[in-house]
Regions:
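Active-site neighborhoods and metal-handling regions in enzymes and metal-associated proteins
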Residues: 1-250
């Protein structure tokens, strides 16, 4: 079975000899390792993860599809690999690489390879990632199930007198306690007239009143895969107007 990096290189034009991946999410997708730093260099016949001393032990233990190299002088290491594989054209992540990072890369290796900063690499990565394996689907389902379980816990607790901030923290804690590695995004919890704001900010000063709406927008991360759900509930008995509005939005 092909590795993800082998699949990626197959999707790139034949004129591309290698690809450099530096964004956190794509690095994790292709190596299976979560880190805040590291560089993946993929060639037609090999792939490398260059990573600093903070992550080297973990990388050597869990990364299977790349040769792991401890970072010393990053650009010297990249140069050596480009020369070793006789690469002439390298694709970069145009959507995520900063201008400063691109300028530094070009200054260091521009005499060896032509840097392709078109959308060719980003498009190939998107194509790889949009087709989910059964294992990926299971992780997505697990993230959603975790969020739903957290919501059930919060609904059992929810009552008049708590603040929007209380609800936010309760949801966050429930998801993390259930095993989420992170939150999909900052949790939104709003009540009363603020529920008309899709992306409002929870406030400590806003208190849930009897018979009021509470809107919650939240999600959990499981093994790098995110869930995202929005739910609106009524704390107490809704008025007929509230029922009509709720059903219209539904």
């Amino acid at each position: 079975m092909q590795t993800r990096l082998e699949q990626l290189m197959q999707k790139l034009p034949a004129s591309i000899d290698c690809a450099i991946i530096t964004s956190d999410v794509n690095r994790r997708y292709f190596t299976g390792m979560r880190s805040s730093a590291g560089t993946v260099l993929a060639f037609r016949d090999a792939a490398y993860l260059i990573i600093d001393f903070r992550y080297i032990e973990k990388a050597r233990a869990c990364v299977k599809d790349c040769q792991v190299m401890e970072q010393s002088n990053l650009y010297q290491q990249i140069t050596a690999l480009l020369e070793q594989h006789q690469a002439k054209r390298m694709a970069v992540e145009a959507e995520t690489m900063t201008i400063q990072a691109f300028a530094s890369l070009k200054q260091q290796v521009g005499n060896l390879v032509e840097l392709d900063c078109s959308d060719v690499l980003s498009d190939a990565i998107s194509h790889c990632r949009r087709i989910k394996s059964e294992q990926e689907l299971q992780k997505m389902r697990a993230a959603q199930q975790l969020a739903e379980t957290a919501l059930e816990q919060v609904l059992q607790w929810l009552h008049p007198g708590v603040t929007e901030r209380d609800i936010q923290l309760k949801l966050d804690f429930a998801m993390l306690q259930l095993g989420a590695e992170d939150l999909s995004f900052p949790t939104i919890a709003l009540t009363g007239t603020k529920t008309s704001m899709p992306h409002g900010v929870p406030e400590e000063s806003v208190v849930v009143q009897p018979g009021s709406f509470v809107l919650m927008d939240f999600g959990a991360v499981v093994d790098g895969y995110h869930s995202d759900m929005t739910r609106t509930v009524c704390v107490g008995s809704p008025t007929e107007t509230m029922r009509q509005v709720y059903n219209v939005v539904l």
